[in-house]
């Protein structure tokens, strides 16, 4: 369900929130559930959206801005003013497809690094919207991948943990100023 929260899709010189990068402990902590969706939560959503748009991103999880909460904002069409963002509060994956596909991913918390990641082709997720209403969504393609990528952040996982080719990954990380020792491979 598209969000009713509206922010201008533009780059700010000084975004409201600071991004955290690979190696920062906050990215490795499991996020806490949001117990009450209120005006403070909605302001955080606005700030996260503005930070995401300012950073040329299509998805952002609260841990990436140092906030240990289960909150995700996504906009797969940031250049389309008519396309509203998707807000997911306390999301849980209900079902994934058996079909796996590989595609290149990047991350605002690991700038400059783009690697192929295998993920289920289809994901069904349950979540609350910005008004605290329960929602479910079945997603494929870029949106499905983005939801899975951002949900990983809520569990202390970053996309490089899912990369198979460790040699190429180590080279890419090093080339962009990151240490391979920050990677924690997941099965």
Swiss-Prot record:
Keywords: Hydrolase, Iron, Metal-binding, Protein biosynthesis. GO terms for molecular function: metal ion binding; peptide deformylase activity. It catalyses: N-terminal N-formyl-L-methionyl-[peptide] + H2O = N-terminal L-methionyl-[peptide] + formate. Its cofactor is Fe(2+). It is an enzyme of class 3 (hydrolase). It comes from the Bacteria. Binds 1 Fe(2+) ion. Fe cation binds at residues 107, 149, 153. InterPro entries: Peptide_deformylase, Peptide_deformylase_sf. The active site is at residue 150. GO terms for biological process: co-translational protein modification; translation. Its EC number is 3.5.1.88. Removes the formyl group from the N-terminal Met of newly synthesized proteins. Requires at least a dipeptide for an efficient rate of reaction. N-terminal L-methionine is a prerequisite for activity but the enzyme has broad specificity at other positions. Belongs to the polypeptide deformylase family. PANTHER family: PEPTIDE DEFORMYLASE. This is Peptide deformylase 1. It comes from Nostoc sp. (strain PCC 7120 / SAG 25.82 / UTEX 2576). The gene is def1.
